[in-house]
Amino acid sequence: MARIAGVDLPKNKRIEYALPYVYGIGLTTSRKILDAVGISYDKRVYELTEDEVAAINKHIRENYMVEGDLRRKVAMDIKALMDIGCYRGLRHRRGLPVRGQRTKTNARTRKGKKKTVGAK
């Protein structure tokens, strides 16, 4: 099992589909990384040599923000929105949809379980 950016990749998958197991790397980014390092998409994770794993790790470390650093940055960005008191920050603080979705009937995921307001 190859360990890339602190994540154990599944050894039987093709490397282009295994790299997205790292938070912050999707399929497109995975292909860009493999092109830059010069590794075939068809190669399986268990077929990678130590040098190839090291090259992928080095390229990711130098060019991308992944895993803990990226999670921390996203959390800090959301906290900054809440601190400055902008509309998006208020929506985050209240636990409501941030991107303009309707909330009269939907948004159950963000709002949580329905609370009935009693009628007389």
Swiss-Prot record:
GO cellular component, as recorded: cytosol; small ribosomal subunit
InterPro entries for this protein: Rbsml_uS13_C (IPR027437), Ribosomal_uS13 (IPR001892), Ribosomal_uS13-like_H2TH (IPR010979), Ribosomal_uS13_bac-type (IPR019980), Ribosomal_uS13_CS (IPR018269)
Pfam families, sorted: Ribosomal_S13
Entry GO MF terms: rRNA binding; structural constituent of ribosome; tRNA binding
Region listing for Disordered, in residue ranges: 97-120
Family: Belongs to the universal ribosomal protein uS13 family.
Task performed by this protein: Located at the top of the head of the 30S subunit, it contacts several helices of the 16S rRNA. In the 70S ribosome it contacts the 23S rRNA (bridge B1a) and protein L5 of the 50S subunit (bridge B1b), connecting the 2 subunits; these bridges are implicated in subunit movement. Contacts the tRNAs in the A and P-sites.
Protein name (Swiss-Prot/TrEMBL): Small ribosomal subunit protein uS13
Gene: rpsM
